[in-house]
Amino acid sequence: MPKKALDSRIPTLIKNGCQEKQRSFFVVVGDRARDQVVNLHWLLSQSKVAARPNVLWMYKKDLLGFTSHRKKRENKIKKEIKRGIRDPNSEDPFELFCSITNIRYCYYKESEKILGQTYGMLVLQDFEALTPNLLARTIETVEGGGIVVLLLHKLNSLKQLYTMSMDIHSRYRTEAHSDVTARFNERFILSLGNCENCLVIDDELNVLPISGGKNVKALPPTLEEDNSTQNSIKELQESLGEDHPAGALVGVTKTLDQARAVLTFVESIVEKSLKGTVSLTAGRGRGKSAALGLAIAAAIAHGYSNIFITSPSPENLKTLFEFIFKGFDALNYEEHVDYDIIQSTNPAYHNAIVRVNIFRDHRQTIQYISPEDSNVLGQAELVVIDEAAAIPLPLVRKLIGPYLVFMASTINGYEGTGRSLSLKLLQQLREQSRIYSGSGNNKSDSQSHISGRTLKEISLDEPIRYAMGDRIELWLNKLLCLDAASYVSRMATQGFPHPSECSLYRVSRDTLFSYHPISEAFLQRMMSLYVASHYKNSPNDLQLMSDAPAHQLFVLLPPVDLKNPKLPDPICVIQLALEGSISRESIMNSLSRGQRAGGDLIPWLISQQFQDENFAALGGARIVRIAVSPEHVKMGYGTRAMQLLHEYFEGKFISASEEFKAVKHSLKRIGDEEIENTALQTEKIHVRDAKTMPPLLLKLSELQPEPLHYVGVSYGLTPSLQKFWKREGYCPLYLRQTANDLTGEHTCVMLRVLEGRDSEWLGAFAQNFYRRFLSLLGYQFREFAAITALSVLDACNNGTKYVVNSTSKLTNEEINNVFESYDLKRLESYSNNLLDYHVIVDLLPKLAHLYFSGKFPDSVKLSPVQQSVLLALGLQYKTIDTLEKEFNLPSNQLLAMLVKLSKKIMKCIDEIETKDIEEELGSNKKTESSNSKLPEFTPLQQSLEEELQEGADEAMLALREKQRELINAIDLEKYAIRGNEEDWKAAENQIQKTNGKGARVVSIKGEKRKNNSLDASDKKTKEKPSSKKKFRK
């Protein structure tokens, strides 16, 4: 192969980087780009005085025509020699390079293993597998003076990357939205022209016109190095004097920031407080791990025995252990004499150090543990957490306990900005630290690991891995918007407008990611809101915003001042994804198999949870993010933005006139003809003309909204977020039973039906979710705060209002089915303060379920606190001791609330029973009145005595009539006295003669009766011979 003169700009850029301790970036295009890695590495070796640079080679699945296995390479060479296709006396430069160079091969999917490590050269292949996250994670492992090499396959034009399908695009496609536009790739290629330390070259090392460093010139040699930093450190070291071990360890540091950080660590070590936390936050390459290593060496010198270190992987601790041993060297410790090093036997850890045993004065141990092994920290005195932002937040919480804790976190790098640590955990630690310092040691707080801890915060600004102002770092931060957190709104000084004066605009993504200077400034402001208001941020979010076809961006802006040409600062940013409109065939196929396709989170999730085949066919929008800057929080801007968004999708911005025509904005895409007619060596790539791009901000009144049925949101459940979405009219339909691994929060899905759409389905789903949530409160949701659980139940009313409440009220029959008579007696006695709380604990689940199921009438009204107590005790099965801590109230007050609510419920049950008896008695009277209406109430017309006398008279009259009937029924003829007038006169004369003396008995002659119908008794009477009757006067 003939030799060719090398373009002088390539070695010049590498030499300048080594001289300024800055990194260089090379993009190599062509099928033989792999072979140029050897030449670039050789140029780097010639420019650096240090040892041969080590290499990190990142790839997706297969290396570019070679293997990383040394024996396989040797066998391949032997086979080729044996077959006669290779000269045994010649060596391939690339194979020689692979043999003598220290190369670490790593899959992209295992890139977390390289955290905390430093390399002289980075090679990135398989461009289609790259993501913003991988770019930030890998490029920042390269030291100052090193080079980054990106290998691209053969291209006719770099604009082919504008339409290249990336691996991550498969996640963005949905059934209704499958056309992905690679806007991020276009912005990435255009940004290379603004990177002064970047050269884009072909596989013959020809510099292409797009290169940002094409005008590079050699720097004049520097005779003297800048030792101002070392002089400052030396002065600090001298000021410490004989202070052991701080003085010796400060001498190992590289920057003044790092030296001060080590001193802060030493101060906490000397205090030997079991409730201290020291947090170290910095960007990548600032020396966090080195400072932690020196701090551990200081802890050993101060007699700490049990020290535990944790990080995502033991391979991330290479730098940390390296500086532990440098600290030992500064303290005159010798290996094998004073300490031993134990390496891991796990092949996946590549012989990483996992334990150090120190036995100089007494037994001391430095032990690596996995982040999940917080249960082994019982005897810990110091726990060190490196790369804390890369560890799930729940695990970090568990690692904090009654011992000294050091933690380091990257706030500007692949983790996005480490916001989960800074916004969640550190904020809680700050608040607890203020409480602890202000009110002393609170007894209740001391029972929690996190409560009552003191917090010291350290930040490192000056980089160590590379020089301050490294151009690759500046380019990467601008490309991925990693330094957006430093942006400050102008409204902080100009005042805030009223929310009603603000307007919502849709952002054109084609213009936003066009790399135009105005668009870039607006993008940085939007990302600053994301970073400042959200704790889950990743560089991949940027590519999701730009490339996902179903996503849309909206911004809330203050009133526009026409005299001011500058774009106003966005107050609120909304990112949403259009979902749904899935074919019935796909729905049935997925439900029958129990699987779901990618994307369309809410349609698939709700269809699966409720086994409904119609919901996924509805069109909807999911709020991916709503970000408001911290200075605008709780001022009504988020509510205003959501109000305008709802109105937009409800069609309230569209004019009712027939003349309305929606404005359609489109951007011309790169065609095949344009690519074929260009040459790579002469191609000039620049930002699109502003006249060909659509407006950055689109008025909602000029756009045709998509036909949607609902707007939904999926978020990690927190009290503040749940309160916001409930206030916006959203109804919960799904709550994940397992907490998220990264944040420890339960995912919640809430929906709101747009005005004018069918809403019965939402009411049915809400009722079903309400019942399921009640049943699950005693299981996975037991750890919820009672107030949060109550708020979730209350939010269901936003959906159940669309259906008629079919819940029947409690009846006496149901009461008898649920409670026995003994249960009601116990409850009544407890409500009268005659029994202890434990006697009725078994009744609380029944009472709570009846109350929250809506069985009790509306007259039973419990205060929110009483409802929380009933829910916590009856549905979550919590104890009074637990509630005492949760509500921050003494137990006697909680029990008093329980007694009050018991009285209200018992009173209601008594009323139901009384009403049931009254209805039973009233039914008899109703039957007697033959279904007539009951007469109106009239007062009594007489007194009680008169009423009694009247009743007695009626009774006597009835008695007489009955007696008369009986008398009339007797035959008296047989007792009649017979005789004529002569006989009676004779009798009277006889009486008169006696004149009252002697017997007054007279006799009258009778007649015999003739009656053929006489009975047998009368016949016997007739047979008697007596014919006279006697009577006494």
Curated annotation (Swiss-Prot):
The keyword Repeat does not apply. Transmembrane segments: none annotated. Acetyl-CoA binds at residues 626-628, 633-639, 727. GO terms for molecular function: 18S rRNA cytidine N-acetyltransferase activity; ATP binding; tRNA binding; tRNA N4-acetyltransferase activity. Interacts with tan1. RNA cytidine acetyltransferase with specificity toward both 18S rRNA and tRNAs. Catalyzes the formation of N(4)-acetylcytidine (ac4C) at positions 1297 and 1815 in 18S rRNA. Required for early nucleolar cleavages of precursor rRNA at sites A0, A1 and A2 during 18S rRNA synthesis. Catalyzes the formation of ac4C in serine and leucine tRNAs. Requires the tRNA-binding adapter protein tan1 for full tRNA acetyltransferase activity but not for 18S rRNA acetylation. This is RNA cytidine acetyltransferase. It comes from Schizosaccharomyces pombe (strain 972 / ATCC 24843) (Fission yeast).
